[in-house]
Amino acid sequence: MLGGIKMNVLTMSECCKRKLDETYLVVYAIKNEINIKKGDYIEKSDIYTLVGVDIKGYRQLINVYQDKVNNSRYWLECFESLKARGLKSILFLSVDDNKNMKRTAKIAFPGVVFTDSITDIAPKFYKYTSEKDSKKLAGKLHDLYTQKTATDFKTSFDNFKKEYNNVIHQKLIEKYLSNTEGLYKYSVNIRQLLFKHSANIYLYDRIRISFNENKNYVKDLNEIYEKLGSIDDYFGFKSFKKREWTLILNDLIQLYPNIDFI
């Protein structure tokens, strides 16, 4: 309330139409599988929630999209719509193996670098891990990406493989974690930015729990916006303490000297 005038509060769907910043350091593409009703049929569909971190370290919900695997131009249209909202560059895109998204992201933002998505990898391990151990597993996966040095990573990775040593886990490790060491060309501070997963896991779980894949369905994306809750959970907060952010920014300036971060 301002001077007796009641102020309108933006809804989640309205926030996803606002003007964007020119640059996002990282955009997390968080995938959930939900049921969507089309006519008389209910089919499973992948939903991607895009969350960006701006150059000041603030997280912003960008939008929610329903993947269209048979439309090779769909993601290009999505990225072009983001550019129309003011977005000019994405430094890192944390995404699963969605080939259409990666291909078209490179067209829209030629300098983008793709990184693993922990919110995609962790649930693949959850399927074959007891419920009480899933949180511990998520922490260990995060640790694989955020060791101080490549030598520390190798030690951590060896221990991870020893602990998760059944045939299924070994197959998952080979398929999804075999290239993790390559990310150690980036400093630990930048990797903390790329794989700061706690807030992303919260969003992933919020959609997963709200739309149980065996019990619920939606008719359109507006129902997802409604379930996401308050905009305060997705806008205007930092995921990093001041010292953490200073170290991240210091390393980004060295990696991207032509970008004005400050």
Regions found by a protein language model. Give the residues of each.
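Intrinsic-disorder/low-complexity, polar/charged segments
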Residues: 54, 68-74, 146-153, 217-221
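Short alpha-helical patches at protein termini and domain edges
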Residues: 7, 84, 99-103, 107, ...
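Basic, amphipathic alpha-helical segments enriched in Lys/Arg and hydrophobic/aromatic residues
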Residues: 207-262
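RNase H-like nuclease fold core
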Residues: 2-92, 199-200
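Switch/connector loops and helix/strand junctions flanking conserved nucleotide-binding motifs
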Residues: 35-37, 100-104, 124-128
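Acidic/histidine-rich, metal-coordinating catalytic segments
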Residues: 30, 90-100, 120
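Amphipathic, well-packed alpha-helical segments that form the structural scaffold of globular domains
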Residues: 79-80, 204, 208
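Extended amphipathic alpha-helical interaction segments
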Residues: 106-203, 210-215, 227-228, 233-236
